[in-house]
A protein has these predicted regions:
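Nucleotidyltransferase catalytic core that binds NTPs
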Residues: 1-383
């Protein structure tokens, strides 16, 4: 009996500020085959075609490798996907979301593989995009940093336009509220309960704008046991100790982001800030881990949230070996606010033009009684 063919699936992209929308696309792609190979573009390529990335290429390579559905990462993948690339990495076809990715010249980056019949589509996750997240962070300039050069009215309106739903915005990167469902969470969850003899490790935090610091911390925590449970604080708790407009992402967005990565076995949604005996007993926790690079504030009553596990002798501090923080990412955006405003605005203009062209093509195909997803888009680059 002949061996069953291993289907190798190719995905590629910038994967900047990796979020659960990226992960959901990769999850769907993995379901179409046996092995998922992900190509990640360089900083130079992204800057040329879209504007500067928030995360550098080494950070992006590392983050994509951490996603649970990814088998291999190809560093420095070309911006336009070619048949040659698919053949080079022994991939049968490539998968992309049902939005359009364009070069700096306004050409569909998947044109060649579409013509070759080696292109498949999956559903894009509505309600989240890197453009949207950048827009949310830009809005923090009004209250979070209290800059002396407060945004004037025109600048404020321009900034808000990057994070507000509007008919004039791209349907792919405009803000539409993410609507969580139990089905979505189940698709992301590991679905395996701990075995009777598993050493169960517990960590907790906000995990806002999930980044390389979070990933490094979870990887170190996972090494201490067999099953890692991650408690994720509610929006109210995060806002209580961080203030202003935090968290950037809602509780359910943060839950899906954490569940996307390999170290996570289970999450506690809306975990208590202080780790209680009840929590430890309920989840049969053997070790409670705290990272030593991020400050944890005491409760309102000035109580150490790790007091109970310390008394029980199950508390263990670990070094995440990475200094990145959510605030550091916000600072990257705010310190280069003008650059990212321009990048977001240009990206939306290009996508609006592409969307209109795609709709026109679909209407023409319907009028001729045909359908399909292998249309090739080419538009003029909007200035």
């Amino acid at each position: 009996m002949a061996e069953e063919k291993i289907v190798r699936v190719w995905c590629d992209g910038c994967y900047d500020m990796v979020h659960f929308g990226h992960a959901n696309q990769l999850r769907q792609a993995k379901q179409m085959g046996n092995k998922l190979i992900v190509g990640v573009h360089t900083d130079e390529e992204i800057t040329k075609h879209k504007g500067p990335p928030v995360f550098n290429e080494q950070e992006r390579y590392r983050m994509v490798r951490g996603i649970k559905w990814v088998d291999e990462v190809v560093e420095g993948a070309p911006y336009s996907t070619t048949v040659k690339t698919l053949d080079q990495y022994n991939c049968d076809f490539c998968v992309h979301g049902n939005d359009i990715t364009l070069t700096a010249d306004g050409i569909d980056t998947y044109a060649e593989v579409k013509k070759a019949g080696r292109y498949k589509e999956c559903e894009r996750t509505a309600g989240v995009s890197t453009t949207d997240l950048v827009g949310r962070m830009l809005l923090l300039t009004r209250s979070h940093h209290n800059l002396n050069d407060e945004l004037d009215l025109v600048s404020r309106e321009r900034t808000e336009s990057l994070s507000t739903d509007s008919d004039s915005h791209s349907p792919w990167t405009r803000v539409s509220r993410f609507l969580p469902s139990t089905q979505t969470i189940m698709q992301f969850a590991e679905g395996r309960p701990p075995a009777p003899n598993d050493i169960i490790v517990y960590v907790c935090g906000s995990f806002d704008l999930f980044h390389i610091g979070h990933l490094s911390f979870l990887e170190e925590a996972r090494k201490l046991g067999d099953y890692l449970i991650i408690g994720i604080y509610s929006d109210n708790i995060v806002n209580e100790y961080k203030g202003n407009n935090y968290p950037i992402m809602s509780l359910h967005e943060r839950v899906l982001s954490v569940l996307s990565f390999k170290p996570a076995s289970e999450v506690v949604i809306g975990a208590p800030y202080s780790i209680t005996q009840e929590l430890i007993d309920r989840f049969r926790i053997n070790i409670v881990v705290q990272g030593n690079r991020v400050q944890h504030h005491p409760t309102i009553d000035d109580i150490d949230p790790y007091e109970v596990p310390k008394q029980l002798g199950i508390y263990k501090p670990v070094d995440s070996k990475n200094d990145e923080t959510t605030e550091g990412i916000v600072d990257r955006i705010i310190n280069h606010r003008r650059v990212f405003e321009k990048r977001n605005a240009k990206k939306e203009k290009k996508e609006i033009a592409a969307y209109k062209a795609l709709q026109k093509l679909k209407e023409e195909k319907c009028s001729h009684g045909s359908s399909g997803t292998n249309e090739v888009i080419c538009i003029e680059d909007p200035k």
